[in-house]
Amino acid sequence: MRYCGSKARFMKDLAPILTKHLDGTNTFVDAFMGGANVISYIAYPKKIGIELNKYVFALWKEIWVNSRIGVTPERWIPETITRKQYDFIKNGYINNDDLLSLWYNDWEIGYVGTCCSFGGAWFNGYAAYNKKKKEDHIKEARN
């Protein structure tokens, strides 16, 4: 997942520091999971990821559950999110609209709020197709 504040580019240097005290009896805790770049980089059997944003947490939970039963993202993540859908979900979230949960699951709100947002930042604007670079950020998020 592309996520604002990603530590992915620092992992080569961070990993030795973060794993220095892991001895097989303790647990690695990623206290700021976000895009899960840290926890996915650490090769260690006992790991816990903590995410404060309930929608991002729900998205990771959905990914985990589906991966355990062999359901690939192509089968459950929407192929596209239109600007209209993005704006509807964003406005519902901002206005704390209870009706939003009737239309969308928490994981869907998490997906749209991060994966379909510019730079992966929480509802930072619709990640539209970039004609100049020929990048489809919505399609990339799904893959």
Predicted regions and their residues:
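S-adenosyl-L-methionine
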Residues: 1-33, 37-38, 42
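Class I S-adenosyl-L-methionine-dependent methyltransferase module
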Residues: 45-143
